Amino acid sequence: MNMEEIVTLSVKHNVSDLHLCNAWPARWRKQGRMETAPFTAPDVDRLLLDWLNDAQQYQWRTHGQLDFAVSLSGTRRLRASAFTHQQGTSLALRLLPERCPDLAEIQTPPIVPALLASENGLILVTGATGCGKSTTLAAMVGYLNQHADKHILTLEDPIEYRYTSKRCLIQQREIGQHCATFAAGLRAALREDPDVILLGELRDSETIRLALTAAETGHLVLATLHTRGAAQAVERLVDSFPTQEKEPVRSQLASSLRAVLSQKLEVDRQDGRVALFELLINTPATGNLIREGKLHQLAHVIQTGQQQGMMTFAQSAQWRQAQGRL
């Protein structure tokens, strides 16, 4: 089978990821579980020769690993991670949705559109790898593109969803191709007149510091972070800095954070996967706790903040059960 046929078959079976290696049979991931795939994988090294441009080939030969995205004719766009190991070369492929979903399809908490109306501040989308953070960010961009007149600048590694400017002017930059690092791209973005900056990932303290500065200086910053809960995300941001910097960082977060939306995927009754959400909103009480370093109390704030639009994973699960999804 060629890759177009493999992707078509994978879509038919609700597969989220493909794992290809010349040293063993192909595997795919369905509803979070790894299974042996019912096809023979094409030669991985040949695929990379076909898919990578000259600059990517150089990075691949130099570093032995590469993240990129590829569009296959007539099928889905794929996010790819190629890497070498003891047995040879492997490709991990994530099948991206056919189109950018909207917030109503994902069924994010009802207050999310109001949060996106903020003129500035930081909105974090967090969760484990493969839980749909990029899809949620894409839905947020899609919402703004339909409802606001903004300049949106994205910094991604790699570019996953391709946007068409509608009401918004959307410009997408890929790390390694259009700028060297997230920090370098973000530093440049502050001179490029964006209203909204999308950061594919907050990877280090320099990027976090620049994101907070951007959020404080009149930009709405949307970013992802690898944590399993909303409260843990705040702790992770603060802990990225040395002790002497934690207090000013907490002060910045207390004033610039708008919300943390954490998510995870569960298998639903339709043999698919459904997103559950946890939402922390930066109310005055939340900001005071962050400023004072009482981060351990944030989980309680979420549990008691339903009236302000907050949501726990348990409340989200109850909502899904009422819909008949769980």
Where are the regions that the model predicts?
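Short, flexible helix-loop junctions that flank or precede catalytic/ligand sites
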Residues: 1-326
